[in-house]
Amino acid sequence: MKNYIFFLLLSIITLNSFAQEFQGKAFYISKTKMDPNFGKNMPPERKQRIMERLKSNLEKNYELDFNSTSSLFYEEERLSVSGGDGRFNFMSFMSPFQGILHKEFGTKTFTNRIEFFGKFFLIKDSLPNSKWMLSGESKQIGIYMAYKATTSREVPEQVFQFGRQSENEENKKSKMKTVNIIAWFTPQIPVSTGPHKHGGLPGLILEVSADNTTVLCTKVVMNPNDRIKIKEPNKGTKVTQREYEQIRKDKIAEMREMYGRNRRRGGGSGNRSR
């Protein structure tokens, strides 16, 4: 135990003293399991069609550019599975992360640029103040020795469902739920960041599991020949995280109402409405 405490202290010292002149790029793969309650009010045939459309969105590849003061997290470019014309997109609601995320370590703030129904938003807010518990467990991830840390976080429950909801279900959607988070970090890369908004540990997070999603680092490139430029996104409507969640919730309610109207008319095409 004494050796473990000494190791952690050494890691923090390393983070402060050697993290001055370096940069790197980490590559991650994200896998999400479908929520078993998804589409519980939906006809089986329709649910199956949507599940097929969602498959490609449950596994994604991301990149994380980082230096000693900031990082930039984003999805690797690929052919779009849906148009960017502002049409309703089921897949966007199943992704645990959207857009481009810039983190500033010194101020512990983030800027997340997201496109939502054809409009760009700049979510600017404070990073979660995660209270990590270090277990002392370790494992090898690639060439790096990683150490286990756990925490929990309150997040909004998934607010989008198909079909008719009861009053109780409507009220439930505004509640929060507790998500347990397991992270594996390596002090060999002394930067306090990781995928999504995760960070605050004395080393790069190589693997993290939260809710139904696991993100695993597949490769790290330190100090590449081509210098990495980390720029904070600056185009879009500025909102806080809370304000964006309300905008998103209102839009989902609007789409649900539109979907219900189309069903009552017998069109069954709510998902194609603009």
Language-model segments: what does each one mean?
Residues M1-A26:
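Bacterial Sec-dependent N-terminal signal peptides
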Residues E21-R274:
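Extended soluble regions of mature proteins
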